[in-house]
Amino acid sequence: MVTVLDTVSKPRPRHPEKAHRPDQEVLRKPDWIRVKAPTSRGYLETREIVKTNKLVTVCEEAGCPNIGECWDKKHATFMIMGEICTRACAFCNVATGIPGPLDPNEPANVAKAVREMGLNHVVITSVDRDDLNDGGAQHFADVIQAIRAATPQTTIEILTPDFLRKDGALELVVAAKPDVFNHNLETVPSKYLTVRPGARYFHSIRLLQRVKEIDPSIFTKSGIMVGLGEERNEVLQLMDDLRSADVDFITIGQYLQPTKKHHPVKKFVTPEEFKSYETIAYTKGFLMASSSPLTRSSHHAGEDFERLRAAREARLSLAKTA
C-alpha cells in the first residue's frame, strides 16, 4: 500500500508511517490518571532554559503526563541526537523519519543547561539512530564527559536505545561510566511484533546483562508499560528475565495512547494491581521497584537514585555480617 502525503500545503505529519492505519478508539482515562495542566513558575523557567539552549526533551516529545510536576522542580530528561527517530514503535509519540546530522555543540549545550538548572541528577535519553555506524554511542559518551567536566557532582543516568547490530557501541557508552544505565524493555515479548517491531526482546535483555559484566558498579534499570494486552504471568516472567540479567531497578507504568493512530489501550490497570507488581518485584530480588499508573522511567529519578544507592549499601552490609 502506498500512502501519498501532501507536504507542500500541509506540514510534514509527525507519524507518516502510521497515516494508513485505521483510527483506534481512545479510551477515557480513569480518575486516578488525571493530572493538572502545567502552569507554574518553575515549569516556565525550565521551558525557557530548554529553549535557550536549543535542547530537546523527551518530556515534550513523548507527551509525558508528569511534565508539569517534573519541570516545576527543575527536573528534565534531555533527548539527544535530534527529535527524529529511525524506528516506528506503535506506542511512541516521538516523530519518525530520516534524522539530520548530529549537532557537535549538543554535549556542551546539555552540560550548560545542567549547570544552569543546578541538577544533582540528570537523565539523558535519545532517539534511535540506526543510520549511524555506532548508533550514537560516541555522542552519548561525549555528553556524559561534558557533564562531568561542567558539574562533577551531578550523577548521570542514561536511557539508551538497543544499539542493535552496532558492534562495540555498548562498550563505548559503558566506558564513559554513567551512574545508571537504563534500557527499557517496554513490553512483554509476545507484544514485540505489534508494539516494538524494530527491536528484539532477548537482545535487550542481553544488553542489560552485558553492562553488568563490563562494569558491575553501574546500576542497571529497565521499564515496561502495562495495558497493552499483556497477561499478568507474562509480566512476572519478564521480571525473572530481568533478574537473570542482574538488573537492579524495574519501573512499571500505564500505557497511554498518544493518538488514534497508535496502539490502543487494552486496559487501565488499577493502582492496586500496580502495587501488587511492586511487591512481587521486591520479592524477586530487585534493589528497587516503582510501579504505579503514572510511573515513567525518569519520574523522580534523582530521589530514586539516592534510594537505589542506599539499598545497595544496605544489601552489601547485610552480606558482610551474614
UniProtKB/Swiss-Prot annotation:
The keyword Transmembrane helix does not apply. Gene3D superfamilies: Aldolase class I. InterPro entries: Aldolase_TIM (IPR013785), Elp3/MiaA/NifB-like_rSAM (IPR006638), Lipoyl_synth (IPR003698), rSAM (IPR007197). GO terms for cellular component: cytoplasm. Residues 1-24 are annotated as: Disordered. Transmembrane segments: none annotated. Residues 71-287 form the Radical SAM core domain. Residues 14-24 have a biased composition (Basic and acidic residues). It catalyses: [[Fe-S] cluster scaffold protein carrying a second [4Fe-4S](2+) cluster] + N(6)-octanoyl-L-lysyl-[protein] + 2 oxidized [2Fe-2S]-[ferredoxin] + 2 S-adenosyl-L-methionine + 4 H(+) = [[Fe-S] cluster scaffold protein] + N(6)-[(R)-dihydrolipoyl]-L-lysyl-[protein] + 4 Fe(3+) + 2 hydrogen sulfide + 2 5'-deoxyadenosine + 2 L-methionine + 2 reduced [2Fe-2S]-[ferredoxin]. NCBIfam families: lipA, PRK05481.1, PRK12928.1. This is Lipoyl synthase. It comes from Chelativorans sp. (strain BNC1). The lineage of its organism: Bacteria, Pseudomonadati, Pseudomonadota, Alphaproteobacteria, Hyphomicrobiales.
